[in-house]
């Protein structure tokens, strides 16, 4: 499949056109940002790991009936994905209180929530991705009521699945961000899961030590990000357990194939 012109560049990914008008290529960058782009860096190998981890999670979600934009991983940094119209909302799912919510509401960090909490933020870097209510979404036609109801049902299933998946490898799923888009097929729009699911978009803590295995390592200067992301990939079975990876050699990873 031929890669065409660049259609869009965000903080962590670039979208390219292809020879198929219904498909695009998603390229994972090594750029790391935090605090609405106020803190920036380039971390060699981050894009490779996020590509592999997101492919693994989205593929597993497909198996349980969660339709998403992933078609296949093209190479170490790129995926072929379905072209969707992104709904301009970030859906934040919280299982444990940490980060901005603790400051906003004066809640003790690490408080386990009685049930998953869903928050909405408008995707707008210039405005700082402000927190909004469901009424805002409906009032400004960012999504319809039926679209929101479908998204909420998908989110509950995704959360249940991911909690179990990570728990099985000794990781607590603290919170995560999801994005959804409208897929146009046969003249109709269908809302599906889009973007990525990776340590860039999730907070992941070791189940025993509470060690941060996500982008908070960059946000809070807790140490190198690559070993933490590599640890997540190893635990999920994406990489050989014996692999000792660094930011230098991570880009040379090859696909792990099951032995017959």
Curated annotation (Swiss-Prot):
Keywords, ordered alphabetically: ATP-binding, Ligase, Nucleotide-binding, Purine biosynthesis
Gene Ontology molecular function, alphabetical: ATP binding; phosphoribosylaminoimidazolesuccinocarboxamide synthase activity
Pathway, per record: Purine metabolism; IMP biosynthesis via de novo pathway; 5-amino-1-(5-phospho-D-ribosyl)imidazole-4-carboxamide from 5-amino-1-(5-phospho-D-ribosyl)imidazole-4-carboxylate: step 1/2
Entry-linked InterPro entries: SAICAR_synt/ADE2_N (IPR028923), SAICAR_synt_PurC (IPR033934), SAICAR_synth (IPR001636), SAICAR_synthetase (IPR050089), SAICAR_synthetase_CS (IPR018236)
Keyword Membrane: no
Reactions the enzyme catalyzes: 5-amino-1-(5-phospho-D-ribosyl)imidazole-4-carboxylate + L-aspartate + ATP = (2S)-2-[5-amino-1-(5-phospho-beta-D-ribosyl)imidazole-4-carboxamido]succinate + ADP + phosphate + 2 H(+)
GO biological process: 'de novo' IMP biosynthetic process; cobalamin biosynthetic process
Enzyme Commission designation: 6.3.2.6
GO cellular component: cytosol
Listed CDD domains: SAICAR_synt_PurC
SUPFAM superfamilies associated with the record: SAICAR synthase-like
Family: Belongs to the SAICAR synthetase family.
PANTHER family assigned: MULTIFUNCTIONAL PROTEIN ADE2, SI:DKEY-6E2.2
Name of this protein: Phosphoribosylaminoimidazole-succinocarboxamide synthase
Organism, scientific name: Pelagibacter ubique (strain HTCC1062)
Upper lineage: Bacteria, Pseudomonadati, Pseudomonadota, Alphaproteobacteria, Candidatus Pelagibacterales
Chain's gene name: purC
């Amino acid at each position: 499949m031929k890669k065409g012109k660049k259609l869009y560049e965000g903080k962590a990914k670039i979208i390219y056109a292809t020879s198929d008008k219904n498909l695009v290529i998603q390229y994972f960058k090594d750029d790391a940002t935090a605090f609405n782009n106020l803190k920036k860096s380039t971390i060699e190998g981050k894009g490779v790991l996020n590509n592999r981890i997101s492919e693994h999670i989205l593929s597993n979600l497909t198996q349980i009936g969660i339709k998403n934009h992933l078609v296949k991983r093209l190479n170490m940094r790129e995926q072929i994905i379905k072209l969707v119209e992104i709904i301009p909302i970030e859906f934040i799912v919280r299982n444990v209180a940490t980060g901005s919510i603790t400051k906003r509401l004066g809640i003790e960090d690490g408080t386990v929530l009685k049930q998953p909490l869903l928050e909405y933020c408008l995707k707008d870097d210039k405005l700082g991705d402000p927190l909004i209510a469901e009424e805002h979404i409906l009032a400004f036609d960012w999504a319809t009521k039926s679209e929101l109801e479908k998204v909420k049902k998908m989110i509950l299933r995704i959360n249940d699945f991911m909690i179990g998946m990570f728990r099985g490898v000794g990781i607590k799923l603290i919170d995560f961000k999801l994005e959804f888009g409208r897929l146009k097929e046969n003249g109709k729009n269908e809302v599906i899961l889009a973007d990525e699911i990776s340590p860039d978009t999730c907070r992941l803590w070791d189940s025993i030590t509470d060690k941060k295995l996500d982008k908070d390592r960059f946000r809070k200067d807790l140490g190198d990000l690559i070993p933490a992301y590599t640890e997540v990939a190893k635990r999920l079975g994406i990489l050989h357990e014996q692999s000792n990876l660094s930011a230098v050699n991570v880009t040379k990873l090859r696909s792990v194939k099951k032995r017959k």
